[in-house]
Structures are given as C-alpha cells and as structure tokens.
C-alpha cells in the first residue's frame, strides 16, 4: 500500500492516505482539502505525525485506492474508547448532508444545486464556521469527481452548473473540523442509468468503529 495518486492540479500528487487523531485533525492542508494533519515534519506537513492517539478522541482515516489506474476515496471514523455525544451528533449531521448531496445528484440536478442544498442544511445545523475546515482555511466543496486523477471535474461546489454525467464517479465527503479534531465520512459513488450507487462500502461498513 504505497505510491502517490495523480492529481489534475499541477504539480500536485497526493499520498495514499491521511490518518489523524484529536488536535492533529484540526490542522489544515496545504492544498484544497478539509483535513491535513501535522505530517512527520514541517517539510512534509501532511497526514500522520508522531502524536499518540488518546482515549475517547476521534480518529479519522481517509484512504485513496487505485484499481488499474482508477481511483476511489473513502473515509471512516474510529475511536479508542467511546466517542462523546457531541461528536456522535456531528457525524450524524454529516450523514444527513451526504444524503442530501446524493439525492440531488441522483435526480440529475447540477453539482451546484447539490452544493446549495447540502451547504444550506449544514448551515442550518450550525456548521457554517466548521464545514470542510475552519476559517480562513475552509474548502468550498462537498464532493469531487474521481477517475484517473483524484481531483476530476465536476465538483460539488458553487459554479459547477452541470450534473454528474452518466458513468461519472464522485467522492462525496462532508466533514466538520474543530481545533480539537475532525469528523466526517466519505464514499465514492457512480451515477448510472438508475441513479447514484456506491462504489465503496457506504453503509455496509460502519461509519464509526470503537475499539
């Protein structure tokens, strides 16, 4: 499980995964992503560092896999112990935001419409300051197309006034970020003639695993 993932935005390439816990989950990325992490060194400031995982804090695992060159992206949450009710509620709210994105894209509406509806729901939940990062480093998207590269188009964001095409694949990844950590979920979806269906596990793999 190694190597880099190609990105459309030159000259970036992406590591295969980000694993962050607690306060490391509140560290922003050097590129347009909700979660960055400390990395092992300031000169490699992305992903896992040397911070020890503490009891009852959220652990986010965001992994990218390439099968015969085609990319999928998936995020799940873990906790050593028990997650607080506050973090549980945040995760439930992000699942509702995800369902909104999937529903709008399933209807063949534009990616911008999916952003508008899902972002509006997140604001209604009270996440305007924390959705996809903390100000001033918030990312302004809720999903990105995937294919031969990680950051394909269209994107669930303002300005993308076209639908996800039939045969298109989209990683949908609402997350909320705080100084004390982050939480969210992500799965890759494909739109076919019958609508949206998950390529990765979606609800078949638990959103949260306690150990």
Predicted ranges, named:
Residues 1-211:
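Active-site neighborhoods and metal-handling regions in enzymes and metal-associated proteins
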């Amino acid at each position: 499980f190694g190597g880099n993932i190609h990105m459309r935005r030159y000259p970036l390439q992406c590591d295969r995964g980000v694993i962050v816990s607690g306060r490391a989950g509140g560290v922003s990325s050097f590129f347009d992503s909700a979660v960055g992490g400390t990395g092992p060194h300031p000169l490699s400031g992305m992903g896992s560092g040397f911070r020890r995982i503490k009891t009852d804090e959220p652990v986010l695992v965001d992994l990218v896999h390439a099968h015969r060159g085609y990319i999928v992206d998936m995020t799940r949450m873990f906790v050593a112990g028990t997650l607080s009710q506050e973090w549980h509620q945040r995760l439930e709210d992000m699942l509702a935001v995800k369902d909104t994105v999937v529903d709008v894209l399933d209807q063949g509406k534009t990616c911008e419409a999916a952003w508008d509806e899902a972002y509006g729901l997140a604001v209604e939940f009270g996440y305007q300051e924390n959705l996809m990062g903390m100000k001033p480093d918030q990312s302004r998207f809720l999903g990105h197309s995937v294919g031969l590269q990680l950051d394909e188009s269209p994107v669930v964001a303002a300005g993308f006034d076209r639908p996800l095409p039939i045969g298109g694949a989209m990683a949908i990844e609402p997350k909320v970020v705080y100084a004390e950590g982050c939480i969210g979920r992500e799965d890759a979806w494909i739109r076919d003639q019958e609508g949206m269906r998950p390529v990765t596990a979606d609800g078949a793999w638990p959103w949260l695993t306690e150990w």
